[in-house]
């Protein structure tokens, strides 16, 4: 049993070191600035050193606060601005579930990679449409 514990501990150290050494060359955007994003997702992205170029939210009042909180990040209310930026390779989406389908549709049409919180949509018909878009644009969806 002692050997198994040593092996598990060794693997955990290796995994943590590997995560810290990973260097992301691409830039990403994040849509949404709610409690779940702030408490769970942004800290993980920071820990993994994922370079965010944009944070998008509905409220223009929050834009200066976002830029002050996240150095080097451009805050915007425009998803289209993000999707037009060729430097952005992927978009993380964590908004109200009712908005997921519309945002995911635009991201997939742009050809960018998409990470979307569950549920990605609100009906089987919408899911079928998202899957068709994913195939048509050869997009990565997580």
Regions found by a protein language model. Name each.
Residues 1-70:
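N-terminal Rossmann-like dinucleotide-binding module
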Residues 31, 56, 93-94, 117:
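Active-site-adjacent beta-strand anchor residues
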Residues 38-39, 60, 76-79, 124:
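Structural motif corresponding to alpha-helix initiation and N-cap regions
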Residues 50, 72-73, 112, 139:
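Short glycine/serine/threonine/alanine-rich loop segments
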Residues 54, 74, 89-90, 140:
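Short, Asp-centered acidic motifs that coordinate Mg2+ and/or phosphate
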Residues 74-86:
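Short acidic low-complexity segments
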Residues 90, 96, 101-142:
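Beta-strand-loop-alpha-helix segment that lines the small-molecule cofactor/substrate pocket
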């Amino acid at each position: 049993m002692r050997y198994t514990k040593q092996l598990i501990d060794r693997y955990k150290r290796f995994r943590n070191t590997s995560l810290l050494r990973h260097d992301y060359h691409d830039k990403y955007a994040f849509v949404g600035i709610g409690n779940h994003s702030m408490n769970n997702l942004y800290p993980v992205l920071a820990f993994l050193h994922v370079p965010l170029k944009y944070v998008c939210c509905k409220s223009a009042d929050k834009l200066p606060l976002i830029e002050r909180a996240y150095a080097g990040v451009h805050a915007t209310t425009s998803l289209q601005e993000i999707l037009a930026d060729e430097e952005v390779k992927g978009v993380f989406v964590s908004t109200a579930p009712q908005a997921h389908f519309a945002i995911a549709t635009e991201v997939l049409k742009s050809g960018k990679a998409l990470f979307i919180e569950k549920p990605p949509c609100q009906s089987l018909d919408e899911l079928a449409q998202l899957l068709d878009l994913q195939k048509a644009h050869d997009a990565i969806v997580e």
